[in-house]
UniProtKB/Swiss-Prot annotation:
Interacts with SLC35A2; the interaction is reduced in the presence of SLC35A4. Found in a complex with SLC35A2 and SLC35A4. Interacts with MGAT4B. It comes from Homo sapiens. This is UDP-N-acetylglucosamine transporter. Belongs to the nucleotide-sugar transporter family. SLC35A subfamily. It comes from the Eukaryota. The gene is SLC35A3. One of its GO terms (cellular component) is Golgi apparatus. It catalyses: UMP(out) + UDP-N-acetyl-alpha-D-glucosamine(in) = UMP(in) + UDP-N-acetyl-alpha-D-glucosamine(out). Keywords: Antiport, Autism spectrum disorder, Disease variant, Epilepsy, Golgi apparatus, Intellectual disability, Membrane, Sugar transport, Transmembrane, Transmembrane helix, Transport.
Length: 325
């Protein structure tokens, strides 16, 4: 049963990661009449959906009792304001990160984005060393060097990109800066969140509700500051269609899927899922979206990144001493 849950959770992770990247890219580049949906509002809606999903999970853990659910939410959130406030910092950073991903996929093809975004492994590792005093082994440090080399190859401009007039250097640079900033914020927020989880006994679902609460507030502030005029003119849900809602739901489920993978799987299998997602994104970008032509340099970089992903999660087991009779 446990093995089935492990592979089911990994399968869902591959589907969620690949689908989110591709549908988000498609929704941001699709030419359509009327105003395009605002990414800032999509981030807010995704946070609200995540809160609802986590409340349902807490309700399930409370043996489907509304009274027990109300008591848990009251005791763990309202009666512990300082614990709740701890989530304000990572929540604000996650909100920024989610907005940056829309910017990145508006300017980069899905395959390049997927591979470059794996730099979050590097930032997470560095923040883990500095904030959690985590010790990295030889394989981990080697994987980080391979990772940086692979991403550099992926970002290496090809002749077709240099000659292309459709995709300006400016938009490529904006996309790259958005991904790099998202990697940095993902690493810091992820380690900060892990530190909080290890220091307290609150469930991951309660913590996600707290994250979603602050995320909604920060997200609404972003809507007001950057898109307030457009919202007042065309409405909060302007440009929303079936594809937009698919993107929003997939983004809302992301954190929950990761939580399930952490619970049922390990780093090596998670690395396999990430690698498979990169391969699928590359194939679909080439054959379906037709906005990406892979080069030999890209393939070399992608192979290095996939290798680094596996190597970072590799945990060599020391040879056990044979037991004496």
């Amino acid at each position: 049963m446990f093995a089935n849950l492990k592979y089911v959770s990994l399968g869902i992770l591959v589907f969620q990661t690949t689908s989110l990247v591709l549908t988000m890219r498609y929704s941001r580049t699709l030419k359509e009449e009327g105003p395009r949906y605002l990414s800032s509002t999509a981030v807010v809606v995704a946070e609200l959906l995540k809160i609802m999903a986590c409340i349902l999970l807490v309700y399930k853990d409370s043996k489907c009792s509304l009274r027990a659910l109300n008591r848990v939410l009251h005791d763990e959130i309202l009666n512990k304001p300082m614990e709740t406030l701890k989530l304000a910092i990572p929540s604000g950073i996650y909100t920024l990160q989610n907005n940056l991903l829309y910017v990145a996929l508006s300017n980069l093809d899905a395959a390049t984005y997927q591979v470059t975004y794996q730099l979050k492994i590097l930032t997470t590792a560095l923040f883990s060393v500095s904030m959690l005093s985590k010790k990295l082994g030889v394989y981990q440090w080697l994987s980080l060097v391979i990772l940086m080399t692979g991403v550099a190859f992926v970002q290496w401009p090809s002749d077709s990109q240099l000659d292309s007039k459709e995709l300006s250097a400016g938009s490529q640079f904006v996309g790259l800066m958005a991904v790099l900033t998202a990697c940095f914020s993902s690493g810091f927020a992820g380690v900060y969140f892990e530190k909080i989880l290890k220091e307290t006994k609150q469930s991951v679902w309660i913590r996600n509700i707290q994250l979603g609460f602050f995320g909604s507030i920060f997200g609404l502030m972003g809507v007001y500051i950057y898109d307030g005029e457009l919202v007042s003119k065309n409405g909060f849900f302007q440009g929303y269609n079936r594809l937009t809602w698919i993107v929003v739901v997939l983004q809302a489920l992301g954190g929950l899927v990761i939580a399930a993978v952490i619970k049922y799987a390990d780093n090596i299998l998670k690395g396999f899922a990430t690698s498979l997602s990169i391969i699928l994104s590359t194939l679909i970008s080439y054959f379906w979206l037709q906005d990406f032509v892979p080069t030999s340099v890209f393939f070399l970089g992608a192979i290095l990144v996939i290798t680094a992903t596996f190597l970072y999660g590799y945990d060599p087991k020391p040879a056990g001493n044979p037991t004496k009779a």
